[in-house]
């Protein structure tokens, strides 16, 4: 009996303990559920607030984009109007420059004076001996942009006695490209269609010339060495060191070019620096000997390029940053250009500045390289005044 009572007491005690633990567990779970419900309610509240802020931000962004779109349209309209006004001003400037050109800087071989007394002293026989070619530029007739190929600086030119085009990409390399025609160059993707020509020594600057099947270039060496390269036989035909002490650029705005080799109707020439001015040398295209030298008195400052037509040097000037290029200094080795007929030519505004200008006497065109663009300028020529009216005999 006692055992039964003891067993019942133990059973009741165990049941009471289990009830206590169960109640504690339920209380814990209930508290955790309440905490989770509070967190969920807080998350919902924050989510609603974030959604509200996002909608407000989207509305503000949409309003701002709409305002920016209106401002952009207005700015574009203003820029188009400004561009039209600038074009109109440039056309008016072209007209004014054509009608009232400022007096150019003209230099002649012997400091020519235009007085009648001096003119009468000149002999007619001497005049006809010197003037092998008697053309002078009167104006730019047309401009054509062929394509854009390669580096901002370079050179392209054509041998006057063939249809081949030669491209020098950059200012220092030993590789150039030959194209059989203008059409082949125009249709080529880059220089892919060109024939690659590798010369023994790297060329320097953009002062190269192609004349009668030969390439004449300044070698990139410690000396100012002219290399004559046979384009037919792919071999060096001759070399010569120019007797020039200065290694300054011949044109201030193109510091890579130390000497500019030029070919025209009368043969091969070299333009080189001498102090603050540009000097000219007539070269024998066969032996590379220097036959005669002149001080053109054309300043190197702000010069970007030059070209020669019929023994007359035309130096092209610009500004930094680039503006409109212009011929502002003319030098005639035949002493046949007067102040009144020396042209002051403005080139159309383009992309940057000329890194090279090469004249083709057969086509009467300039091959120009401007910020990677290959440009052709068609020239209008006329007879020099003294060719039309030679000085009288004594």
Swiss-Prot record:
Q: What name appears for this protein in its UniProt entry? A: Olfactomedin-like protein 3B
Keyword list (alphabetical) reads: Coiled coil, Developmental protein, Disulfide bond, Glycoprotein, Secreted, Signal
- Where are the disulfide bridges? 133-310
Q: Which residues form the signal peptide?
A: 1-18
What is the superkingdom listed in this entry's lineage?
Answer: Eukaryota
Q: Which family does it belong to?
A: Belongs to the OLFML3 family.
Q: Which residues form the Olfactomedin-like domain?
A: 132-383
Query: Which species expresses this protein natively?
Result: Danio rerio
């Amino acid at each position: 009996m006692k055992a039964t009572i003891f067993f019942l007491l133990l059973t009741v005690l165990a049941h009471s303990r289990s009830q206590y633990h169960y109640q504690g567990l339920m209380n814990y779970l209930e508290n955790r559920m309440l905490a989770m419900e509070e967190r969920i309610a807080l998350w919902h509240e924050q989510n609603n607030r974030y959604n509200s802020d996002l909608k407000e931000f989207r509305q503000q962004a949409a309003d701002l984009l709409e305002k920016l779109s209106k401002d952009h349209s207005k700015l574009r309209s203003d820029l188009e109007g400004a561009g039209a006004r600038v074009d109109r001003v440039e056309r008016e400037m072209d007209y004014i420059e054509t009608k009232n050109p400022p007096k150019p800087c003209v230099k002649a071989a012997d400091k020519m004076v235009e007085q009648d007394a001096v003119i009468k002293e000149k002999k007619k026989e001497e005049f006809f001996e010197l003037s092998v070619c008697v053309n002078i530029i009167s104006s730019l007739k047309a401009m054509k942009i062929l394509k854009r190929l390669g580096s901002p600086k370079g050179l392209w030119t054509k041998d006057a006695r063939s249809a081949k085009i030669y491209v020098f990409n950059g200012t220092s390399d030993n590789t150039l490209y030959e194209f059989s025609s203008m059409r082949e160059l125009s249709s080529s993707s880059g220089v892919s269609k060109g024939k690659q020509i590798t010369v023994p020594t790297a060329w320097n600057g953009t002062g190269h010339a192609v004349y009668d099947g030969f390439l004449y270039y300044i070698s990139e060496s410690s000396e100012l060495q002219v290399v004559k390269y046979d384009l037919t036989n792919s071999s060096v035909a001759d070399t010569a060191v120019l007797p020039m002490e200065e290694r300054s650029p011949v044109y201030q705005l193109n510091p890579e070019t130390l000497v500019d080799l030029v070919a025209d109707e009368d043969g091969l020439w070299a333009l080189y620096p001498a102090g603050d001015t540009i000097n000219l040398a007539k070269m024998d295209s066969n032996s590379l000997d220097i036959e005669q030298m002149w001080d053109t008195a054309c300043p190197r400052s702000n010069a970007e390029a030059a070209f020669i037509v019929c023994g007359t040097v035309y130096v092209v000037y610009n500004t930094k940053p680039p503006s409109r290029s212009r011929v502002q200094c003319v030098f005639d080795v035949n002493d046949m250009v007067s102040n009144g007929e020396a042209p002051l030519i403005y080139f159309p505004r383009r992309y940057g500045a000329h890194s090279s200008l090469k004249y083709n006497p057969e086509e009467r065109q300039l091959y120009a390289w401007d910020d990677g663009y290959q440009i052709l300028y068609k020239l209008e020529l006329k007879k020099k005044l003294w060719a039309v009216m030679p000085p009288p005999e004594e």
